[in-house]
């Protein structure tokens, strides 16, 4: 096997700001994720194929993919069983991450209603009452706090339910609900499905690949229509439902003369308070005393998306830019909560003056300053954290500072409510545009970054190809940040769209790519798709719509992909999931699910070919609806 040549900065990322910081890191002898990836090569083939099992201590067992060695594990598990079990455990972990996020949001909401979290309040009373009505909670003669208390109890009950249904699944079209029920995959309770995943994958329990994967779909639905949707909705009540606004993105948002505070992770419970604390007059005065012109908060990953959507707080970058933000030498504090935070940040921040501050009771990292965050004294803790950053400003080493000039304007804040409002209150104008052919369909492009592929290349080129062919794109997470950095989240980007989509965007004053939020906010896409399907009297699987995750890497993305497909949306993955060790599992995911759930996966690393797969699917659905 030949040696892999060391990648250049250009080969690692298409983003100019990232390329500059990668070169700076190399010149300074700083290790990044790309360096660690190269040291891992060649990666374990058994792991890549999904045919390694270590679920009991008789193993680990490996299946020979060429049929020349072991065909079964010690217990008799075949490649099909092992691959399916491993995939189910990935779905369980992803669903748990989203759903635990939701649980914390609801618990904060509950504490607020009980007067134990005074830093928080109700920002969207309209949504509060709407959600309460969905749960059959009477509003008559009750205060906002009383209604909120009953809603908090109802939402918490979704996690521990044993028989279901999860209330938000009622938002799906009737045809989809009937299908889930007939297949036995309607989720019963958020926690129950995740626990059952772990039970089923214990030695000697579920050993039929199809049966295992059907429970994977059920568990993912408890995420998409349960945990993630609960998180989105209750965060809107607490912090406000996003509306369109402008902001800026990329590493160039960092300031030369202000205290730079990075918020990184996924839970806005913390980041909302950090944004407020950064405007505290006492802390701003302290910043001046320390020689700074002010306090600049910028986001990384989804907690950044949350504050971007609601406050216009700038975004410094997506997942693979977290290290590069520190490499600028200009970050006083990297404040983290949970999910997608590299433990490598501990060593990295030690090379600069940056304080690496961990805050979550359930997540700590090497090399952190521990400042545990609790809702009961949320704002006070946030002030202490920001104060730590401000007091660190004089320690900045000017000789190490190099902030790329690249930053890009963007328009964000397209919640489902904001989109419907822009359309005049109903999806009818969008449906008319689709029926008339000006808009061919909708593409939902989401997901992570992955060092196995060039940073942002898949995200940006796939989306450009879709809008060029008159597909309106909705986006969340790290894809949204990639598109923003590429200038696709401004109305002027309509110039890159096909004539039909361009005309629609110009008429509405919107970009051809709509930023709908963080990863849990993919639930907003489900709500929008359901609204369109119900207006047409069809199932989601009948819509001219397709999904993609060009650079996915996390277990959360596996759960997302599963619930999107289970909801009826054909989805293209840009990096290969660990399933190729089983022909049966691969065939079920890429073909067989069409006959079961009305949608399936495809795997295509080339973003242009992936776009063609999505366009072909959209055209097929248009034809079936008689729209061609």
UniProtKB/Swiss-Prot annotation:
Gene3D superfamilies: 1.20.1270.30, 3.40.50.2030. InterPro entries: CO_DH_a-bundle, CODH, HCP/CODH, Prismane-like_a/b-sand, Prismane-like_sf. Keywords: 4Fe-4S, Iron, Iron-sulfur, Metal-binding, Nickel, Oxidoreductase. The keyword Iron applies. It catalyses: CO + 2 oxidized [2Fe-2S]-[ferredoxin] + H2O = 2 reduced [2Fe-2S]-[ferredoxin] + CO2 + 2 H(+). Transmembrane segments: none annotated. [Ni-4Fe-5S] cluster binds at residues 266, 302, 340, 448, 478, 519. It comes from the Archaea. The keyword Signal does not apply. [4Fe-4S] cluster 2 binds at residues 53, 56, 61, 75. Its EC number is 1.2.7.4. One of its GO terms (molecular function) is anaerobic carbon-monoxide dehydrogenase activity. Binds 3 [4Fe-4S] clusters per homodimer. Binds 2 [Ni-4Fe-5S] clusters per homodimer. It is an enzyme of class 1 (oxidoreductase). Its cofactor is [4Fe-4S] cluster; [Ni-4Fe-5S] cluster. GO terms for biological process: generation of precursor metabolites and energy; response to hydrogen peroxide. [4Fe-4S] cluster 1 binds at residues 44, 52. Belongs to the Ni-containing carbon monoxide dehydrogenase family. CODH oxidizes carbon monoxide coupled, via CooF, to the reduction of a hydrogen cation by a hydrogenase (possibly CooH). Homodimer. Cluster B is an all-cysteinyl-liganded 4Fe-4S cluster; cluster C is a mixed Ni-Fe-S cluster which is the active site of CO oxidation. Cluster D is also an all-cysteinyl-liganded 4Fe-4S cluster that bridges the two subunits of the CODH dimer. This is Carbon monoxide dehydrogenase 1. It comes from Methanosarcina mazei (strain ATCC BAA-159 / DSM 3647 / Goe1 / Go1 / JCM 11833 / OCM 88).
């Amino acid at each position: 096997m030949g040696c892999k040549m060391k990648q250049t900065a250009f080969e690692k990322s298409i983003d100019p700001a990232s390329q500059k910081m990668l070169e700076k890191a190399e010149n300074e002898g700083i290790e990044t994720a790309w360096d660690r990836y190269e040291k891992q090569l060649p990666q374990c083939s058994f792991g890549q194929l999904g045919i390694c099992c270590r679920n009991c201590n008789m193993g680990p067992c490996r299946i020979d993919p060429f049929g020349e060695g072991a065909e079964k594990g010690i217990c008799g598990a075949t490649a099909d069983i092992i691959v399916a079990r491993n995939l189910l455990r990935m779905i369980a972990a992803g669903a748990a991450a989203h759903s635990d996020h939701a649980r914390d949001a609801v618990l904060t909401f509950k504490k607020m209603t009980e007067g134990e979290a005074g830093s928080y309040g109700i920002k969207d009373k309209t949504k509060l009452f709407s959600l309460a009505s969905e749960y059959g909670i009477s509003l008559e003669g009750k205060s906002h706090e009383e209604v909120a208390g009953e809603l908090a109890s109802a939402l918490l009950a979704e996690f521990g339910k044993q028989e279901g249904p999860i209330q938000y699944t009622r938002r799906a079209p009737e045809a989809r609900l009937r299908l889930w029920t007939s297949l036995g995959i309607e989720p019963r309770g958020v926690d129950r499905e995740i626990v059952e995943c772990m039970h089923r994958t214990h030695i000697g329990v579920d050993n039929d690949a199809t049966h295992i994967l059907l429970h994977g779909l059920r568990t993912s639905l408890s995420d998409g229509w349960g945990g993630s949707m609960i998180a989105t909705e209750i965060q809107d009540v607490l912090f406000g439902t996003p509306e369109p606004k402008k902001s800026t993105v990329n590493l160039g948002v960092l300031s030369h003369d202000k205290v730079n505070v990075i918020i990184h992770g996924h839970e806005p419970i913390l980041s909302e308070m950090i944004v407020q604390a950064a405007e505290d007059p006492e802390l701003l005065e302290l910043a001046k005393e320390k020689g700074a012109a002010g306090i600049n908060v910028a986001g990384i990953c989804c907690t950044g998306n949350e504050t971007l959507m609601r406050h216009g707080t700038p975004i410094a970058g997506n997942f693979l830019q977290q290290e590069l933000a520190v490499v600028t030498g200009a970050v006083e504090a990297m404040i983290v909560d949970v999910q997608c935070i590299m433990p490598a940040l501990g060593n990295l921040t030690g090379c600069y003056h940056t304080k690496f501050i961990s805050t979550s009771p359930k997540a700590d990292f090497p090399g952190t300053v521990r400042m545990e965050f609790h809702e009961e004294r949320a704002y006070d803790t946030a002030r202490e954290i920001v104060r730590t950053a401000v007091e660190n400003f004089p320690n900045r080493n000017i000789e190490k500072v190099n902030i790329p000039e690249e930053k890009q304007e963007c328009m964000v804040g397209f919640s489902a409510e904001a989109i419907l409002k822009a359309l005049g209150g109903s999806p009818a104008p969008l449906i008319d545009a689709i029926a008339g052919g000006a808009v061919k369909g909708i593409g939902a492009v989401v997901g992570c970054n992955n060092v196995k592929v060039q940073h942002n290349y898949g995200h940006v080129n796939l989306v450009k190809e879709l809008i060029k062919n008159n597909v309106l794109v909705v986006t969340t997470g790290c894809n949204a940040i990639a598109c923003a950095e590429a200038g696709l989240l401004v109305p002027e980007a309509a110039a890159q769209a096909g004539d039909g989509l361009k005309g629609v965007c110009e008429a509405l004053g919107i970009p051809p790519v709509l930023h709908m939020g963080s990863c849990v906010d993919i639930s907003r896409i489900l709500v929008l798709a359901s609204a369109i399907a119900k207006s047409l009297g069809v199932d989601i699987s009948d819509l001219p719509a397709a999904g993609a995750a060009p650079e996915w890497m996390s277990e959360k993305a596996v759960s997302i992909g599963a619930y999107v497909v289970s909801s009826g949306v054909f989805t293209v993955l840009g990096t290969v999931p660990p399933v190729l060790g089983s022909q049966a599992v691969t065939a079920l995911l890429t073909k067989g699910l069409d006959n079961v759930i009305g949608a399936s996966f495809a795997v295509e690393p080339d973003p242009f070919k992936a776009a063609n797969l999505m366009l072909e699917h959209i055209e097929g659905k248009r034809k079936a609806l008689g729209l061609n």
